[in-house]
């Protein structure tokens, strides 16, 4: 039996590394990866040459330039250009070299700032985007539309998934530009080590957010990639578009902070600074389609936070 040759682009990132971990447990596939030094995804000729020589059967497109609000505001040209180039180069090369299937990993920032909650797939392009990361979001929307367009024009089977807020091993724990879960894990860890009497969390604690462990994201990605084409098309008509991936359950930032305090073993007070901005009151993805396709998340928030904290400690 010939093994399927699967290229995971972005294998050193949080999602890409989780997909590689799960694929490598199987005996029927050969996982192909390249570091940035080995293959510059911004170089279209290099990408073409790679696909010409490697005979790839499937692609997981998890490579992206990512960053926090400050980075997105400081380098908007880099975010839109590099992400659009990575997507265009890989999707076009995959098409030219007859890659059967491709899965593009997007981001829930593609949806309008004031989207109806929970956010269904049909909310795409129904309103104005969040200004702070608009260039990144536009690039991710372009990736969805590239997949759609190659499906429509060339009868390709290129699919897209839109994850909610992700966390887990290999997340960015940088002190100044990490997302809420790694930022709070680090802050409570340091407060515990220093016996700090309280930890201040920005905002009122009332905004609702949804969080998905990266191992669940990887499992969902593989599940969606492996669906029969007819089943996929029935669930993404009329535009052969994208599917949301999340838990369908959200929690307040207050509940999140208190859970993290318990996981870390912090015994002091958790204080909310309501003078600081809260951001969007609620952001929850509608995952009805994903559930209809037979996939549900398995890692609870408590389990996921505990294992992520263990990874951080190691």
Protein language model features and the residues they cover:
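SDR active-site strand-loop-helix element
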Residues: 9, 34, 59-65, 102-108, ...
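Conserved Rossmann-fold NAD(P)-dependent oxidoreductase catalytic core, especially the SDR/UDP-sugar
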Residues: 88-133, 159
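Adenosine-cofactor binding site in Rossmann-like domains, unifying the SAM/SAH pocket
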Residues: 24-49
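NAD(P)H-binding glycine-rich loop region in Rossmannoid oxidoreductase-like domains
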Residues: 45-84, 96
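Conserved beta-loop-beta element that borders a ligand/cofactor-binding pocket
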Residues: 101, 106-107, 144-172, 182-184, ...
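Catalytic tyrosine of NAD(P)H-dependent dehydrogenase/reductases that use a Tyr as the general acid/base
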Residues: 127, 136, 209
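C-terminal substrate-binding subdomain of Rossmann-fold SDR/epimerase-dehydratase oxidoreductases
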Residues: 3, 9-10, 14, 18-22, ...
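Active-site helix of classical SDR
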Residues: 135, 139-142
């Amino acid at each position: 039996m010939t093994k399927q040759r699967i290229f995971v682009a972005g294998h050193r990132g949080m999602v890409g590394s989780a997909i590689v971990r799960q694929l490598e447990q199987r005996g029927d596939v050969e996982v192909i990866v390249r570091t940035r030094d080995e293959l510059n995804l911004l170089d279209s000729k290099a990408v073409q040459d790679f696909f010409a020589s490697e005979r790839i059967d499937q692609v997981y497109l998890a490579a992206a330039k990512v960053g926090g609000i400050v980075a997105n505001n400081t380098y908007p040209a880099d975010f839109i250009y590099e992400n659009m180039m990575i997507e265009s180069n890989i999707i076009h090369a995959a098409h030219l070299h007859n890659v059967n299937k491709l899965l593009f990993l997007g981001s829930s920032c593609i949806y309008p700032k004031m989207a109806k909650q929970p956010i269904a797939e049909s909310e795409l392009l129904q309103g104005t985007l969040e200004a702070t990361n608009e260039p990144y979001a536009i690039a991710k929307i372009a990736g969805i539309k590239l997949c759609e367009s190659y499906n429509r024009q060339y009868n390709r089977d290129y699919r897209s998934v839109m994850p909610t807020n992700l966390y887990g091993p290999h997340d960015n724990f940088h002190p100044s530009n990490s997302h809420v879960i790694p930022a709070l894990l680090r802050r409570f860890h340091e407060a515990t080590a220093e016996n700090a009497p309280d930890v201040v969390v920005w905002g009122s604690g009332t905004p609702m957010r949804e969080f998905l462990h990266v191992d669940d994201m990887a499992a969902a990605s593989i599940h969606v990639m492996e669906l029969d084409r007819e089943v996929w098309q029935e669930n993404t008509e009329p535009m052969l578009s994208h599917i949301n991936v999340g838990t369908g359950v959200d929690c307040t930032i207050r509940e999140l902070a208190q859970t993290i305090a318990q996981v870390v073993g912090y015994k002091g007070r958790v204080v909310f600074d309501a003078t600081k901005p809260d951001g969007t009151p609620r952001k929850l993805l509608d995952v009805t389609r994903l559930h209809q396709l037979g996939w549900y998340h398995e890692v609870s928030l408590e389990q996921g936070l505990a294992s992520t904290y263990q990874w951080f400690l190691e």
